[in-house]
UniProtKB/Swiss-Prot annotation:
It comes from Chlorobium chlorochromatii (strain CaD3). The lineage of its organism: Bacteria, Pseudomonadati, Chlorobiota, Chlorobiia, Chlorobiales. One of its GO terms (molecular function) is N(6)-L-threonylcarbamoyladenine synthase activity. This is tRNA N6-adenosine threonylcarbamoyltransferase. Required for the formation of a threonylcarbamoyl group on adenosine at position 37 (t(6)A37) in tRNAs that read codons beginning with adenine. Is involved in the transfer of the threonylcarbamoyl moiety of threonylcarbamoyl-AMP (TC-AMP) to the N6 group of A37, together with TsaE and TsaB. TsaD likely plays a direct catalytic role in this reaction. One of its GO terms (biological process) is tRNA threonylcarbamoyladenosine modification. The gene is tsaD. It catalyses: L-threonylcarbamoyladenylate + adenosine(37) in tRNA = N(6)-L-threonylcarbamoyladenosine(37) in tRNA + AMP + H(+). Substrate binds at T136, V137, S138, G139, G140, D169, G182, D186, N284. Fe cation binds at H109, H113, D312.
Length: 350
């Protein structure tokens, strides 16, 4: 089966061709027009998707060395995300499916991330038999899901306020880093001291009140952001500039420690021996290193996506479409956009 995947949920325009679970092409164009605004501007994102989507799709098909009429299914992100951005990809994909008279599969963007560590394993290849804990962490989402052997899943932890990726970007902006600040913090932290300053780790064993975190798998990063801002207001600009790697390392440690501790706690609580990390922040080298060390300490297997599949991409859209179809999902010929978070059901795979 040959599947074309389309992804336009935020600020990446992407198209990918998948053949029997193997990625033949994965073209991603990241938008840089938002940098001066310090964040993604929805209207600009939509216009960029509209400008690029045809060329990106044609490039993906050409790189896969196939003709359009060889496609069996087209899949596209239907939510959650920016409504205008999603509409561009969704309408394009449905229009193309209609023109080719082939089925269409609407995809939950977060589900695609959850299963992205297993891209290229093939639609019929076995995933962890006992299920696994998925940590999906990005600029807009931070959640823990218990993925069961039948591929259904339950959300067992989520952010109560800000996503981890947002915490990276906003604290990075506070210390003068360009948007997106997450990758810059990661690079600076390589040469910094994570113990330079201890920023709070909310709802963890390092919290002041043990009762506030025991058994709690939710996340909170707003307090950490406020702590960074308050601390910076007490420092001179010269001091911040001269200690930038140490500050970046301290910020990263505060975020990573929470992500690692919650993931390990979830795996123990639900008695599974595999953790998979997904989403844009899964490309963070500090997170990968710390999670690997923690998993080795607790006898847990860690599954990581290839870095090219960490951020938003269409290969994960096509890949989960293949999984859904192989598990009995009936494809559609029409679907409406669903930008809201409730599109992510607690138990939803089919």
């Amino acid at each position: 089966m040959i599947i074309l995947g389309i992804e336009t949920s935020c600020d990446e325009t992407s198209a990918s061709v998948l053949h029997n679970g193997v990625v033949l092409s994965n073209i991603v164009s990241s938008q840089h027009c938002h940098t001066s605004f310090g964040g993604v501007v929805p209207e600009l994102a939509s216009r960029e998707h509209e400008r690029l989507i045809t060329a990106i799709t044609e490039t993906a098909i050409n790189e896969a060395n196939i003709q359009k009429d060889a496609l069996d299914v087209i899949a596209a992100t239907a939510g959650p995300g920016l409504i205008g951005a999603i509409m561009v990809g969704l309408c394009f994909a449905q229009g193309m499916a209609c023109a080719l008279n082939i089925p269409f599969v609407p995809i939950n963007h977060i589900e695609a991330h959850i299963f992205s560590p297993f891209i290229n394993s093939g639609a019929n290849s076995p995933l962890p038999k006992e299920g696994y804990i998925s940590l999906t962490v990005s600029g807009g989402h931070t959640l823990l899901a218990l993925v069961k052997p039948d591929l259904s899943y339950t959300i067992v932890g989520k952010t109560l306020d800000d996503a981890a990726g947002e915490a990276f970007d906003k604290t990075g902006k506070m210390i003068g880093l360009p948007y997106p600040a997450g990758p810059v913090i990661d690079k600076l932290a390589e040469n910094g001291n994570p113990n330079f300053y201890h920023f709070p780790r909310a709802l963890t064993s390092r919290s002041k009140s043990r009762k506030s975190w025991e058994g709690n798998l939710d996340f909170s990063f707003s307090g950490m952001k406020t702590s960074v801002l308050t601390w910076l207001q007490q420092q001179s600009p010269e001091s911040v500039a001269s200690n930038l790697p140490d500050i970046a390392a301290s910020i990263q440690a505060a975020i990573v420690d929470v992500l690692v501790e919650k993931s390990i706690a979830a795996a123990k609580h639900y008695n599974v021996s595999t953790i998979a990390i997904a989403g844009g922040v899964s490309a963070n080298r500090g997170l990968r290193s710390s999670m690997q060390a923690a998993c080795q300490q607790h006898g847990i297997t860690l599954c990581l996506p290839e870095t090219i599949y960490s951020t938003d991409n269409a290969a994960m859209i096509a890949s989960i479409a293949a999984l859904k179809l192989s598990h009995g999902m009936e494809p559609l010929y029409r679907y409406n956009v669903a930008p809201y978070a409730s599109f992510l059901h607690k138990d939803n795979f089919s």
